[in-house]
């Protein structure tokens, strides 16, 4: 019997060995194709590309005159200028600017640009506040002087006055060998006019190193690498089949049988994938509902801006920072989004990849991952509900936008599934596909290391499979396809870039930052605990539930060496993926909280596993289950000890979006902490009670499956928050309502932001009843103003901001404008007015004084109130100072009194009928000019007149106020006013909320000049976008600050008057100059060619 059994067992083994021996051709194909794919993939970064070259030459068209050419890299590769001395001789006695790379009156122009300037006594060549050479004008106008030569390259900046000698008799030249002296260029600007004289020339080589496309050779290599890799993987699959065992992968690769044939579709689709449960319906509905009403992620505007600009630029530039360098080597996902912008820029469309990723994650979890964790998990309905609810709650705060964490979560899950499939069937093809998936996941973003963690977690079993197979077919036929699979991503990453350009882009990002060391990883968890949007209720729960389930599972698995019906190998590998990811995240350059979205899928699987591990069938002692319930209550207390905040416009109308949630004055966190204390105390009692105590029906119900209940509760809270926001905001802007309107062509926030194009047009006419009694301030001051004067405003009072020294980037022109008017205004005021108000038409009254303080009062004349209509919903008073008012962010802000009193017609005279406290967005910034808003809807329809009543009863010098007359502004939507064709600098935070506005583009190294700038709310502008887009960091504000003047416009959020939605700024040009015409060409560059380092130094 033993010999017969041994003979039957050895027969198939000999057959398998014979099959492997006869597969010589397949082995050679796998080896050669794999090596070819590997070599071609690795060679791709080194192969040549075709660069689009661009030169800026001046003068243009044979005429002298300024031209604009703002470089996206800010500085050129090199710059040369030649100025004949005859040009200096022909200049007027006062001199002027011969040439400059920026307007002389631009912000910090001397600090950034190069100038050749002639004064009455000298000729100066200056560069970035450094005097390169200064020569007396009389020497330059002498016959000996021939020309002035200026060069600025990586070798330094030098000036040479050809024909002149220094005191030692040497040629008169000077300079500094500093590559950081290369000037910023936004054009060529001059005071010269007329035909261009012979010999006057400026030439700048624009840095277009990133504007490349593959050569034919490189394109063939990319195609060859991809084809060879596919062939190698097919050959590896063929080698896998030689063991004579079937698999799902084998079934899928067989020729399809007709679906109508018996069992055709059933053989094509596994049984587990053909079911549809209530859990599936809830998850799918949850994802679809959240896609419409849910909050977006923090960087959606940033990523959409890059995607919208990429097609025109010719590459995926990091548009807002880092000198326009590309996102490579982590950017292929953004290129997918760039392709999607050809269809639409609407939020619902652009966020489809994350929606699809979430749905696929659930299908993989429910059909592949949970069954792999063992029969106990597969058979547990609470486990499936736990996975579903945790997936939703982890996805909602992190992965409902354009950020790539959702794609990475899917990539990591696919990698894990393929690794498990490889082990289940002892096949290497799934492992090779897992390597491909991990490589492409890592190519999305550095945090794609989570997929690498999945490979590492399954590395040992895969190595055992490799060793077993190598004895049969050799090493190279197995290793070569793996090498090709792991490196084929290079053909995508370096498709249109080279090794040199990607290294330079990486250097720029690392040098400028943020680029934090591995030992600062604690910052990520610190930000999560702060009471900010990054540490909001939803974000805390999305990660902390995963962490709690992870450590609980580790503790139980270590205590219980064997748990019936739980697969230890897959379970430990799942935990290894999460622990490995936490470790690898230490080495990512940024420490943002939104990276926790990576854990959404594996966290859901961990929640399912933990649900089984803490169930009564595993934890039989109620003490342990109650301890876990107490831990859940503590987690909820920690999660609720913050705001219910969501990013930017997603928070509009959401309850408690800027405060800790409360019920009847008691914080929800306190309630959950009390429940934690009760549960922990009961668990402690159970520890000392007899072992069978505490097994009542209530305790068993509470502790059987708490994870899906808690996660389901939190999912309901998130959805309810968004629904409440929509209801409270309707019919004005909310995230969900905007998405609904997108189906009929809505333009997001641009439809609801109202712009006042002409602030001088809406002033009301004062009634003449008391005109003979008006004081020196006219109708604004009324009959007897006390303490108000035409100049009662301190210097440097600007619109919607507080002046800080030194000035921040992105500030308005009024920060640097003269603080006094040269001609007094209509009532003698010399104070500049904001928002384009004309002092010749608009009076001013204020209480600020540096002398003795007094209590001040003002009651203006009555102003005729137009009849109400939908086009004029507001009465506005432009004011400054510490004023009592209401705002969405701060509620009621105490201060001095500025109210609007309205009147009804009476017998022979107007009858005051009530007063209105203003909606004041900037009450916490008392020095700022702003528009106080009084909604017409809150006034009686038969009110016929209004007047301003102002009282400054404080004797503190800082408690001053200033007012202008009331007006009824004529408003237009931002979409109507700005439109969809004018170039706009859309700050990175606002891009997704304004999908119809045209972002300023760039191509061939030159940026488009914007007409407007749209910013987020005051705090976000000051702390986030102004600093991030600073020219010092290679941002777009380096262009606009130097070339343009910004003026904030009066804007309002429709029917949400007390909300600071952001701002619209209009740009005025400093110099009326046309765009420069560039000399374009092409050049073939090797993968190692570099024009030198981008200037990022001070």
From Swiss-Prot:
One protein family per Pfam: Arabinose_trans
Effect seen on changing residue 406 to A: Resistance to EMB
Induction (free text): Positively regulated by the transcriptional regulatory protein EmbR.
GO cellular component, one term: peptidoglycan-based cell wall
Annotated effect of mutating residue 406 to C: Resistance to EMB
Listed GO biological process terms: Actinobacterium-type cell wall biogenesis; cell wall organization; response to antibiotic
Outcome (variant: residue 330 to V): Resistance to EMB
Subcellular location: Cell membrane
GO molecular-function terms, A-Z: arabinosyltransferase activity
Enzyme class: transferase
Membrane-spanning ranges: 28-50, 217-239, 271-293, 402-419, 434-456, 472-494, 541-558, 570-587, 597-619, 626-648, 663-685, 698-720
The keyword Glycosyltransferase belongs to this UniProt entry's keyword annotation: yes
Keyword Lyase: no
Membrane topology: Multi-pass membrane protein
Effect of residue 745 to D: Resistance to EMB
Record's keyword terms, sorted: Antibiotic resistance, Cell membrane, Cell wall biogenesis/degradation, Glycosyltransferase, Membrane, Transferase, Transmembrane, Transmembrane helix
Effect of residue 328 to G: Resistance to EMB
Result after altering residue 406 to D: Resistance to EMB
E.C. designation(s): 2.4.2.-
Main location: membrane
InterPro entries in alphabetical order: Arabino_trans_C, Arabino_trans_C_2, Arabino_trans_central, Arabino_trans_N, EmbABC_dom1
Function of the molecule: Arabinosyl transferase responsible for the polymerization of arabinose into the arabinan of arabinogalactan.
Membership in a protein family: Belongs to the emb family.
Leftover remarks: This is one of the targets of the anti-tuberculosis drug ethambutol [(S,S')-2,2'-(ethylenediimino)di-1-butanol; EMB]. EMB is a first-line drug used to treat tuberculosis. EMB inhibits the transfer of arabinogalactan into the cell wall.
Protein name as catalogued: Probable arabinosyltransferase B
Organism listed in the record: Mycobacterium tuberculosis (strain ATCC 25618 / H37Rv)
